[in-house]
Amino acid sequence: MLCKHLNRTQSGASSRLIMAKKNPAHMFRGKKRAYTRKEYIGGVPASRITQFDVGDKIADFSVEVTLSAKEECLVRHNALESARVTANRYIQTHAGRDGYHLKVRTYPHHVLRHNKIAQGAGADRVSMGMRKSFGRTVGTAARVKSGQKLITLRTSDEFASQAKEALRKSSHKLPTPCNIVVNQK
C-alpha cells in the first residue's frame, strides 16, 4: 500500500544505513562516583591514548608550561588523545623532535556505560527497558578535579610562547575551561 504524502510503502523502511556515532557528553557529565572495577565488566574498550610521554624525556629544559582544569568534570579518553595530538603536532613543528617534552598527567580509569533503549515502532518487543539496565561499556574517562594538572610541556626559553600556544589549542579539545601556568627554572 502506498502512502500519498510519503511516497513509500507503509511497511518498508528507508534503505539508508545509519552509522553508529559517539554519544553526547551530557549523558556522562554528572556521574557522582567512580566506576573502575574492570574485573566485573566484560570487554572494557582500550584507551585511545597511545603515548603519555612524547619528545626528549631526559633533557633539562628551563620552561615548564602546565594545562590545568578549572572545573571538575569527566574527560573522555578520545578527548585526552585529541588534546595530546594537537599540542604535540604544534610544538613539534616549531621546536623540532628533541626541543620539548610533553606529558599527559591523567589516566582514564572511569568506565562509561550506556543502557541502549530502542525507540520507534515495535520498540516494546525488542527493548528490555530498565530490566538488566547495567548497560554496555562505551569508553573510559578520566575523573578530573578543579585545579588538577592535565598536560605538562617542558621546553627551552626560545619556544616558551609556542608551548603556551600549543596548550591553548589543546584546551579547546577538552570539556572544561583550562588554566595555562608558565614556570621558569
Regions found by a protein language model. Give the residues of each.
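Ribosome-associated RNA-binding proteins
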Residues: 2-185
